[in-house]
């Protein structure tokens, strides 16, 4: 017999159910968000061959592993995109709101080796109230890349600890 089990905090499910019931609707079934996300855009070929779908949330990163058109594993690591903003704020000594704006408007996870000699700085409009700092885009992207790499390593370790798949031969969608 096939068994699929996903654990969640009971209070979170109860809260969601109460909100939906208050709208005079009812819950027929629950589905793990990353699983639903994967099914919404993955091709059948990906599902057959094996794929990992990774969803960076604000406070956590969730992932789903699909093999042979079946959900094999879901998991969560306790770091998300908000941790990137916190890292930027701490390292650059700026407010968290400014760090979030910089991350969204100017941040990149890939560090372009071709522009290391050409130093570009963040635009002034990202800094409110005359709080401008001369910060290089390379510095910002290095901070972002470091945290994203750490999060992806945590996902990798969780998947490998269950000996689910040979990750090197599978596609990964972020």
Task: For each feature predicted by the language model, list its residue ranges.
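Nucleotide/phosphate-binding catalytic cleft detector across ATP-hydrolyzing
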Residues: 1-52, 70-72, 95-97, 107-141, ...
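A short acidic Gly-Thr/Ser loop motif
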Residues: 53-60, 66-69, 77-82, 174
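Extended hydrophobic-aromatic, low-complexity segments
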Residues: 73-75, 85, 97, 152, ...
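A conserved active-site cap/scaffold subdomain adjacent to cofactor or substrate pockets
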Residues: 78-100
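Feature representing long, continuous alpha-helical segments
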Residues: 82, 86, 138, 142, ...
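Hydrophobic alpha-helix feature that most strongly marks membrane-spanning transmembrane helices
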Residues: 93, 104, 153-156, 160, ...
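Short glycine-rich phosphate-binding loop at a beta-alpha junction
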Residues: 162-174
């Amino acid at each position: 017999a096939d068994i699929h089990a996903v654990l969640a905090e009971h209070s979170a499910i109860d809260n969601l159910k109460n909100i939906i019931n208050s709208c005079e609707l009812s819950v027929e079934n629950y589905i793990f968000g990353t699983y639903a996300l994967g099914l919404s855009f993955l091709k059948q070929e990906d599902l057959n061959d094996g794929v990992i779908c990774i969803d960076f949330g604000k406070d956590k990163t969730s992932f789903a592993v699909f093999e042979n058109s079946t959900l094999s594993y879901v998991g969560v690591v306790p770091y998300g995109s908000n941790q990137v903003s916190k890292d930027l704020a701490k390292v650059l000594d700026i407010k968290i709101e400014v760090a979030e704006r910089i991350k969204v408007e100017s941040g990149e996870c890939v560090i372009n080796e071709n522009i290391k000699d050409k130093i570009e700085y963040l635009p002034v409009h990202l800094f409110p109230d005359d709080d401008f700092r001369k910060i290089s885009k390379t510095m910002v992207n290095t901070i972002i890349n470091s945290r994203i790499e750490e999060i992806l390593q945590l996902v990798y370790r969780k998947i490998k600890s269950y000996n689910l798949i040979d990750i090197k031969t599978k596609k990964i969608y972020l």
